[in-house]
């Protein structure tokens, strides 16, 4: 049996994520597919912010305790550092497993007791070289084949969505955010903006 998985921060979930998952689940019917949400969040520097912190402010918003963080697997407390309810909702229509790990090494260790012919990692074409280098650095490149997943919508990314929040571009924000999440994101948009404004004052 072949195993396929994808890993990402999903910060936040976009219609691009859902499109890619939809396409690949239908393409790889009758096999095991795993969606892995990366649960590693770096700690922010409270004394002096950097442009990188502003660009990835969701991570620092989480690590500063603005949003409650609990690290656990989906079958345990079912919590994600961003929002476990969003995770469950987004993948509720798919016959796949959702789990939380720190990195790709932990991902493959989860499957060590599962018999499979080959382990495949699906990613966007913009992440292909990056993931290959990471796997080589972790000495697990021989255990995983990295493939470009199909179904990704051009021009839609978490980066674009985060930039829309920073620019207070609510129209773009609503056009990219995964539809099931919209009802929760009015407060989130305000919270995110307040934090990025706070970071800018520290630069």
Predicted regions and their residues:
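Nucleotidyltransferase catalytic core that binds NTPs
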Residues: 1-203
């Amino acid at each position: 049996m072949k195993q396929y998985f994808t890993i990402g921060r999903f910060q936040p979930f976009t219609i691009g994520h859902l499109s890619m998952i939809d396409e690949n689940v239908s393409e790889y019917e009758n096999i095991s597919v795993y969606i892995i949400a990366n649960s590693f969040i770096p700690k922010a520097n409270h004394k002096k912010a950097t442009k990188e912190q502003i660009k990835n402010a969701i991570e620092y918003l989480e690590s500063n305790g603005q949003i409650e963080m609990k690290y656990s697997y989906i079958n345990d407390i079912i919590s994600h550092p961003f929002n476990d309810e969003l995770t469950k909702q987004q993948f509720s229509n798919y016959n796949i497993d959702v789990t939380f790990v720190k990195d790709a090494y932990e991902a493959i260790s989860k499957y060590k007791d599962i018999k499979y012919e080959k382990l495949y990692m699906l990613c966007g074409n913009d992440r292909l070289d990056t993931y290959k280098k990471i796997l080589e650095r972790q000495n697990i490149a021989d255990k995983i084949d990295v493939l470009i997943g199909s179904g990704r919508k051009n021009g839609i990314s978490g980066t674009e969505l985060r930039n829309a929040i920073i620019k207070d571009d609510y129209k773009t924000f609503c056009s990219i955010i995964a539809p099931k999440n919209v009802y929760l994101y009015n407060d989130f948009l305000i919270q995110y903006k307040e934090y990025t404004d706070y970071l800018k004052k520290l630069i």
